[in-house]
Structure formats: structure tokens, C-alpha cells
């Protein structure tokens, strides 16, 4: 039995060595299959996606400033407050504006009365011309009757001279009356009272004063959230003083900074998937490429890089790509300006344009909150004109 055992002992390592070779072969084949599968997956799928985490949420920041100078009496909104379009944000002291408005109304009433008097004078001066014409005709008639009598020596020369002087005087008075009438007409230009230049100018001053009074109430031009409030009650502000900012929660987008080696296949309209740090992988935003910027970030910086130097080092540049977000998703999962995102662009479809070639036909944004209707002040002006026109 010992002899049989001695002859079988060397066969065990041979069997183990064969198993090890087969295992290594299987692992090698498995790795090759996985590598090929990954290669195929990259060729068919992954190579059509460009990804970057150098991407941040951007949005509109509406800087609130006053349109008139004044002293702040009330501040109606603070940081993080929600405001609607047309809500009052800041109130200025209206005393000076109200005084200017009252002064403008008084000036309009005075201008209407003066202009109305000029129009009345025009009728009086026209009547005076008729009177002077009659006087001239009478003087001329008297003189004509006396000429034959003077030639026949039936009246004295002095009386004839007096008649001649009366004609000259009447003619001079008629000329003066005509000049006065023309001068008065030049003042009123033969137009209606409300269309007179002096009245129009005074009415414009009333409108300006009324607008200044209305603008002591600083309102929000858009619906959004208040940020960066700097104004305080009692502060003296001017039209260039930043008061606060209003940030709309809608119409946000992502500025993704892709390397210049990633943008060759990017086109306008390509679909984008966005993941944010604030919500993580639980929320996937969908969007699309709406445009590629016309310059890299360094090219538009305050101090552009100077590459014409001896120690130049090449650095891969990044180009901002603007990505539009789904507004419904924004309403459900609101974002904030400056948040970090991970962006993946599907570049499979390359039928779109690299650069936009259509002119925008609609406004990017519209706000009518600060448009002030002049109907109330125009009615007030009409009432003042009627009340002082006599």
C-alpha cells in the first residue's frame, strides 16, 4: 500500500495547476468580454454625452432703484420676503413732491386765466379796429367835404388843415389798433385755449409733478423674492441708489462651463440632464441647450490673460453654455441663483445650429408694473382749464 501511495502523490499538484490555468483563462476571458462591452457601450452611448460639474444656476436679478430723490419713510419688504408685481417696496416722504404738485396746479390755473384774457383782448382789439376804421372814414369824409369849400374860400385854411390832421390822426390810430391786434394774435396763435403753448407747458409741469408724487411709492416690477436689501428708513436716496433686488423664482437657467475639447459636437436644442447638489440624485431636471457663448470666461474677464509672454503655459479654456430648464420642474423644485449642478448633454442629434441664426421677435421679459396711466392727471388738467377759462 505504501508503494501505491508513493506513486499517486505527484499527481495532485498537476491537477491543481490545471484548475488554476482554467480559472485564469476564464477570468481573462471575462475581463476581455467586460472591456469589449464597455468599449461598445462607450462607442454607442457614452461618447455622445458631455458632462461637467462646473455649472451653476443663474437667473434674473432685478435691481430696485428709485426714479426720484427723496427721504425713505417706510420699507415694506425684507430679505427672503415674497412680493408680487406691483407691490410697494419702499415709501418716500411725499411732502416736497406734494408741494411741487400744488404749485404746478396753481401755475396752470394762472396760465389759463392769462391766456384766456389774451383771447378776450383779441376780440376787444378787433372791435377797436372797426371803431378806428369808422373814425377814419368819418374824418376822411369830413375832409373831402371841406376841400371844395376851402378851394372856394368859404372856409379858412386853418379849418381845412384841422380836417386834414384829423384824417392823419385817425389813420395812425387805426395802424396802432392793427398792430396791437397782430401782437395779441401772435401770443395766442389763433388756437384753442387748451392748445395754447403757455397752457401746454403748464400742463406738462403738472404731469411731471404728479408723476414725481406717484413715484414716491417704489413698487416691485416683477413677482419674486427680495434679496440684498440695503435701504433703511430715514436714508436720503437718489435715482442711482441701489435699494434691494427682486429675484423671480421662474425663468432660471444653468450656465455650464464646458472645456473647449467638449463642445465640438454641441448644438442648440440638444437635450440636457441636470442634477443639483441641493436635491441630489432624487431630482433630475430636464433642459436643453439654448446657446453657446461667444467667448470664454477669461476673454471677458476684467483683466484678460496676456498670452504673448515668454513663460506662456497652455491652459484648456472653458466656454459657457446656456441651458434652459423645464419651468414646471422649477415650480415643483425651486432653485436659487448660484447653486452647483452636474450637467450632462446628449450630443447624439447634431442637426441643430452651433450659433443662433434667428432674430428674437418677442421680448425676453416684460413688466408693466411701473407704467403709470396719465388718465387721472389729464382729467385733473381738463378740470382746471374749464374752471379757469371763464
Curated annotation (Swiss-Prot):
Residues 120-180 form a coiled coil. Its main location: membrane. Residues 1-24 are cytoplasmic. Keywords: Antibiotic resistance, Cell inner membrane, Cell membrane, Coiled coil, Membrane, Transmembrane, Transmembrane helix, Transport. The keyword Transmembrane applies. InterPro entries: CusB-like_dom_1 (IPR043602), CusB_D23 (IPR032317), MFP (IPR050739), MFP_proteobact (IPR005694). It comes from the Bacteria. Disulfide bonds: none annotated. One of its GO terms (biological process) is response to steroid hormone. Belongs to the membrane fusion protein (MFP) (TC 8.A.1) family. This is Multidrug export protein EmrA. It comes from Escherichia coli (strain K12). The gene is emrA.
